[in-house]
């Protein structure tokens, strides 16, 4: 077996397909040989063993001392105890029943009105997962209309509230936060709650929490008698929460088949428990990542789905892959700086954007093409200019143009996009991430960099409070003086805070030149 990208034998030998879900995986255009695949067999013995331990309930997130159980969500029978098993089954049933009753108008607001919309408040995986679900699967005029607050940009919040306007009384406000203490969803929730109550709308009639039992958010929702609380277990991480209530509730509210989505993920999970590398799609996919990046993440992953409904999938994978695999240390404490950078948009748009560099520029990437074989039922106007055939031609042409320049790629083909195949596709990448992490000996389930960022942000927020307190005294302050009065602060973040607070704000008098921060003198306006 050679490394020839255009070898038909290599393509046939490494093409994976499963007829239950009609998904193909082709890694033949990655630079590897048969001998290299064989060389990973011993490593994969350890990989399969570690995944088996994880699924059995081992403490896999060492930093947080918790289990990692998103695979149980798709097959409760493998959960480590009957309590967790029964909890999963109950949660799935509750979500399906709730969605059905909302869509049938059995559950209504306090004014006996049927719900029409959802304003979803969630950060990271708590926002990206639901967005992927609705963008990929929602049919026109079916189910509730979804809007998202996935950032605390004040313009975004104002825009979404303005768009909903008259529909606010019939909007469900879904707040997702496992701990209930994450600042962004908490701040967004408080702003939206005040706005809603100012419009004389009863918040608790429309509010839903997705959170961990006994969290801050859980207690608040209980105390205020919110419409519903759905469980988000301690053992589910944000980036792998899409088969929990975080992803299942949107499915139910757009009238999609919750059980089929779970079944697709479960089928893929089972296929990736096969211990023969060539018969295991996640083993093949993670091996392709490993060989392309020489086991040290030398190449970026460029995700190109050739279907608009999967455009969000690139962003979804960005978090799943980068937050899981971007690690400074391996499990032995050695500095390794592992990771795979992910970006992408959609084909064929990207052929007119950055594919030029992919073919002729620096060779620091591999592509993941995602192809769909189906076509809309209403295609009578297509005539001889069938867009499906053109799209397929563009994909194959781009793939061929890249391989002719020895640029590496992976191709995943789905017969159609539905609950079953989307569930399977997501599970494939989740499993591949787990496998790759084991191959390079890192923990895929912690996020020390994210936690460090949260800690640093909390310090800045504390500085902001202290700056405000100082300026409220009515005295004049330089950046240097403020810095000296706030313990452990430095001048640069204080300047950022002052500029954010005071620039263009008539509440403050400013002397000096903004291009020379040392000259800036600030005083609270006494008017």
Swiss-Prot record:
The keyword Cytoplasm applies. SUPFAM superfamilies: SIS domain. It catalyses: alpha-D-glucose 6-phosphate = beta-D-fructose 6-phosphate. CDD domains: SIS_PGI_1, SIS_PGI_2. GO terms for cellular component: cytosol. Transmembrane segments: none annotated. Keywords: Cytoplasm, Gluconeogenesis, Glycolysis, Isomerase. GO terms for molecular function: carbohydrate derivative binding; glucose-6-phosphate isomerase activity; monosaccharide binding. Pathway: Carbohydrate biosynthesis; gluconeogenesis; Carbohydrate degradation; glycolysis; D-glyceraldehyde 3-phosphate and glycerone phosphate from D-glucose: step 2/4. GO terms for biological process: gluconeogenesis; glucose 6-phosphate metabolic process; glycolytic process. The active site is at residues 323, 352, 454. Its EC number is 5.3.1.9. It is found in: Cytoplasm. Catalyzes the reversible isomerization of glucose-6-phosphate to fructose-6-phosphate. Belongs to the GPI family. This is Glucose-6-phosphate isomerase. The gene is pgi.
């Amino acid at each position: 077996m050679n490394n020839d990208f255009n070898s038909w034998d290599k393509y046939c030998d490494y093409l994976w397909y499963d007829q239950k879900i009609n998904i193909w995986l082709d890694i033949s255009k990655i630079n590897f040989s048969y001998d290299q695949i064989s060389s990973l067999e011993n490593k994969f013995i350890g990989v399969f063993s570690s995944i088996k331990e994880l699924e059995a309930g081992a403490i896999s997130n060492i930093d947080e001392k918790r289990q990692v159980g998103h695979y149980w969500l798709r097959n409760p029978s493998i959960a480590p105890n009957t309590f967790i098993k029964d909890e999963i089954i109950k949660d799935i049933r509750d979500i399906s029943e709730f969605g059905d009753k909302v869509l049938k108008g059995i559950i209504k607001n306090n004014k006996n009105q049927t719900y029409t919309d959802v304003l979803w408040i969630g950060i990271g995986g708590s926002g990206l997962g639901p967005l992927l679900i609705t963008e990929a699967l929602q049919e026109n005029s079916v189910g509730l209309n979804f809007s998202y607050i996935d950032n605390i940009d004040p313009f975004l919040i104002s825009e979404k509230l303005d768009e909903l306007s008259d529909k606010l009384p019939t909007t469900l406000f879904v707040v997702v936060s496992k701990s209930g203490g994450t600042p962004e969803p908490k701040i967004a929730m408080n702003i939206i709650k005040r706005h809603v109550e100012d419009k004389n709308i009863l918040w608790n009639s429309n509010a839903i929490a997705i959170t961990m039992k006994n969290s801050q958010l859980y207690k608040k929702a209980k105390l205020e008698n919110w419409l519903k609380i759905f469980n988000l277990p301690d053992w589910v991480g944000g980036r792998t929460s899409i088969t929990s209530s975080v992803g299942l509730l949107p499915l139910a509210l757009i009238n999609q088949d919750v059980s089929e989505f779970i079944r697709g993920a479960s089928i893929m999970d089972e296929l990736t428990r096969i211990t023969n590398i060539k018969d295991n799609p996640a083993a093949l996919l993670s091996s392709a990542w490993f060989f392309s990046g020489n086991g040290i993440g030398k190449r970026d992953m460029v995700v190109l789905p050739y279907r608009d409904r999967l455009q969000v999938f690139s962003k979804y994978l960005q978090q799943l892959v980068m937050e899981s695999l971007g690690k400074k240390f391996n499990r032995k404490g050695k500095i390794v700086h592992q990771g795979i950078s992910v970006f992408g948009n959609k084909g064929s748009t990207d052929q007119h954007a950055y594919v030029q560099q992919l073919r002729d520029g620096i060779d620091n990437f591999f592509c993941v093409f995602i192809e769909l074989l189906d076509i809309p039922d209403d295609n009578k106007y297509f005539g001889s200019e069938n867009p499906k055939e053109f799209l397929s031609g563009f994909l194959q042409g781009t793939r061929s143009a890249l391989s002719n320049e020895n640029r590496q790629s992976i191709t995943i083909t789905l017969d159609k996009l539905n609950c079953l195949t989307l569930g399977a596709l997501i599970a494939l990448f989740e499993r591949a991430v787990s496998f790759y992490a084991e191959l390079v000996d890192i923990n895929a389930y912690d996020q020390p960099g994210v936690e460090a960022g949260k800690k640093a942000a909390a310090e800045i927020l504390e500085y902001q409070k202290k700056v405000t307190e100082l300026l409220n005294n009515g005295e004049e302050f330089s950046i240097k003086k403020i810095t000296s009065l706030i313990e452990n602060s430095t001048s640069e973040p204080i300047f950022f805070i002052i500029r954010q607070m005071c620039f263009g704000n008539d509440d403050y008098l400013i002397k000096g030149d903004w291009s020379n921060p040392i000259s800036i003198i600030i005083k609270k306006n006494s008017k």
